[in-house]
Amino acid sequence: MAKVQFTKRQETSQFFVHCSATKANMDVGVREIRQWHKEQGWLDVGYHFIIRRDGTVEAGRDQDAVGSHVKGYNSTSVGVCLVGGIDAKGNPEANFTPQQMSALNGVLHELRGTYPKAVIMAHHDVAPKACPSFDLQRWVKTGELVTSDRG
Protein backbone atom coordinates (compact mmCIF):
# COMPACT_ATOMS: atom_id res chain seq x y z
CA MET A 1 0.00 0.00 0.00
CA ALA A 2 1.33 3.44 -0.92
CA LYS A 3 2.18 5.89 1.84
CA VAL A 4 -0.05 8.96 2.09
CA GLN A 5 1.72 12.15 1.01
CA PHE A 6 0.80 15.13 3.18
CA THR A 7 1.25 18.82 2.41
CA LYS A 8 4.52 20.18 3.74
CA ARG A 9 4.15 22.76 6.51
CA GLN A 10 5.52 26.12 5.29
CA GLU A 11 5.70 27.78 8.71
CA THR A 12 5.98 26.58 12.31
CA SER A 13 4.64 29.06 14.85
CA GLN A 14 3.38 26.76 17.62
CA PHE A 15 3.99 23.44 19.34
CA PHE A 16 0.70 22.10 20.70
CA VAL A 17 0.66 19.66 23.60
CA HIS A 18 -2.25 17.22 23.71
CA CYS A 19 -3.35 14.18 25.68
CA SER A 20 -4.86 11.00 24.29
CA ALA A 21 -7.76 11.22 26.80
CA THR A 22 -7.05 7.68 27.99
CA LYS A 23 -6.85 6.25 31.50
CA ALA A 24 -3.52 5.78 33.26
CA ASN A 25 -3.69 1.99 32.85
CA MET A 26 -3.96 2.24 29.05
CA ASP A 27 -0.56 2.19 27.39
CA VAL A 28 -1.38 2.98 23.79
CA GLY A 29 0.92 4.26 21.10
CA VAL A 30 1.01 5.55 17.56
CA ARG A 31 -0.50 2.34 16.14
CA GLU A 32 -3.64 2.55 18.26
CA ILE A 33 -4.04 6.31 17.90
CA ARG A 34 -3.58 6.02 14.13
CA GLN A 35 -6.40 3.47 14.08
CA TRP A 36 -8.66 5.73 16.18
CA HIS A 37 -7.99 8.65 13.87
CA LYS A 38 -8.66 6.56 10.76
CA GLU A 39 -11.96 5.46 12.32
CA GLN A 40 -12.81 9.18 12.50
CA GLY A 41 -12.21 9.44 8.74
CA TRP A 42 -8.70 10.87 8.84
CA LEU A 43 -6.01 9.58 6.49
CA ASP A 44 -3.45 8.99 9.25
CA VAL A 45 -2.56 9.84 12.84
CA GLY A 46 -2.96 13.58 13.38
CA TYR A 47 -0.06 14.10 15.80
CA HIS A 48 3.63 14.38 14.94
CA PHE A 49 4.80 12.74 18.19
CA ILE A 50 3.18 10.41 20.72
CA ILE A 51 4.76 9.93 24.15
CA ARG A 52 3.90 6.59 25.73
CA ARG A 53 3.52 5.92 29.47
CA ASP A 54 7.14 4.73 29.76
CA GLY A 55 8.45 7.89 28.06
CA THR A 56 9.05 6.29 24.68
CA VAL A 57 8.61 8.89 21.93
CA GLU A 58 6.97 7.51 18.81
CA ALA A 59 6.86 9.35 15.49
CA GLY A 60 3.45 10.03 14.00
CA ARG A 61 3.12 12.20 10.92
CA ASP A 62 6.33 13.41 9.38
CA GLN A 63 7.55 16.36 11.41
CA ASP A 64 7.47 18.73 8.43
CA ALA A 65 3.96 17.70 7.31
CA VAL A 66 0.75 19.55 8.11
CA GLY A 67 -0.83 17.77 11.06
CA SER A 68 -4.43 17.22 12.09
CA HIS A 69 -4.61 18.06 15.78
CA VAL A 70 -5.85 21.67 16.29
CA LYS A 71 -8.50 23.15 14.02
CA GLY A 72 -7.27 26.39 12.52
CA TYR A 73 -3.62 25.80 13.49
CA ASN A 74 -2.63 22.59 11.72
CA SER A 75 -0.75 24.33 8.92
CA THR A 76 1.50 26.22 11.37
CA SER A 77 2.07 23.79 14.23
CA VAL A 78 3.60 20.56 15.48
CA GLY A 79 1.41 18.31 17.63
CA VAL A 80 2.76 16.29 20.57
CA CYS A 81 0.43 13.87 22.37
CA LEU A 82 0.95 12.48 25.86
CA VAL A 83 -0.78 9.13 26.45
CA GLY A 84 -3.18 9.47 29.39
CA GLY A 85 -5.07 12.46 30.70
CA ILE A 86 -8.32 11.13 32.18
CA ASP A 87 -9.28 9.35 35.39
CA ALA A 88 -11.43 6.23 35.80
CA LYS A 89 -14.59 8.35 35.45
CA GLY A 90 -13.41 10.14 32.31
CA ASN A 91 -12.56 13.42 34.01
CA PRO A 92 -9.37 15.37 33.23
CA GLU A 93 -6.42 14.16 35.29
CA ALA A 94 -2.73 15.00 35.09
CA ASN A 95 -1.82 11.32 35.42
CA PHE A 96 1.30 11.49 33.27
CA THR A 97 4.42 9.68 34.40
CA PRO A 98 7.74 11.35 35.25
CA GLN A 99 9.19 9.54 32.22
CA GLN A 100 6.57 11.12 29.96
CA MET A 101 7.21 14.60 31.30
CA SER A 102 10.95 14.17 30.88
CA ALA A 103 10.40 12.98 27.31
CA LEU A 104 8.06 15.92 26.63
CA ASN A 105 10.74 18.30 27.89
CA GLY A 106 13.23 16.66 25.53
CA VAL A 107 10.91 16.80 22.51
CA LEU A 108 10.06 20.45 23.14
CA HIS A 109 13.76 21.28 23.59
CA GLU A 110 14.61 19.63 20.26
CA LEU A 111 11.73 21.37 18.51
CA ARG A 112 12.85 24.73 19.92
CA GLY A 113 16.26 24.09 18.39
CA THR A 114 14.66 23.58 14.98
CA TYR A 115 11.93 26.24 15.28
CA PRO A 116 13.27 28.83 17.78
CA LYS A 117 10.44 31.35 17.29
CA ALA A 118 7.58 28.89 17.88
CA VAL A 119 5.56 29.12 21.10
CA ILE A 120 4.53 26.21 23.30
CA MET A 121 0.76 25.95 23.71
CA ALA A 122 -1.85 23.60 25.14
CA HIS A 123 -4.80 22.50 23.02
CA HIS A 124 -7.09 24.14 25.59
CA ASP A 125 -5.43 27.50 24.88
CA VAL A 126 -7.29 27.71 21.55
CA ALA A 127 -10.26 25.35 21.90
CA PRO A 128 -12.95 24.72 24.55
CA LYS A 129 -11.34 21.47 25.71
CA ALA A 130 -9.57 20.18 28.81
CA CYS A 131 -6.77 18.75 26.63
CA PRO A 132 -4.00 18.16 27.70
CA SER A 133 -5.58 17.96 31.20
CA PHE A 134 -2.82 19.94 32.92
CA ASP A 135 -1.63 23.51 33.25
CA LEU A 136 1.06 23.47 30.58
CA GLN A 137 2.37 26.99 31.18
CA ARG A 138 2.74 26.30 34.91
CA TRP A 139 4.66 23.11 34.11
CA VAL A 140 6.92 24.93 31.61
CA LYS A 141 7.72 27.62 34.20
CA THR A 142 7.96 25.54 37.40
CA GLY A 143 8.00 21.84 36.49
CA GLU A 144 4.86 21.38 38.59
CA LEU A 145 2.25 19.05 37.08
CA VAL A 146 -1.24 20.23 38.07
CA THR A 147 -4.56 18.98 36.66
CA SER A 148 -6.50 21.55 34.67
CA ASP A 149 -9.98 21.22 33.21
CA ARG A 150 -9.78 24.46 31.24
CA GLY A 151 -12.16 24.52 28.39
Swiss-Prot record:
GO molecular function: N-acetylmuramoyl-L-alanine amidase activity; zinc ion binding
Residues reported to bind Zn(2+): 18, 123, 131
Gene3D superfamilies from the UniProt entry: Peptidoglycan recognition protein-like
Statement: the UniProt record of this protein carries the keyword Ion transport: no
GO cellular component: host cell cytoplasm
Primary localization class, coarse: host cell
Pfam families: Amidase_2
pH dependence of activity: Optimum pH is 7.
Enzyme Commission number(s) of this protein: 3.5.1.28
Regulation of its activity: Binding to the viral RNA polymerase inhibits amidase activity.
Similarity section: Belongs to the N-acetylmuramoyl-L-alanine amidase 2 family.
The protein, known as: Endolysin
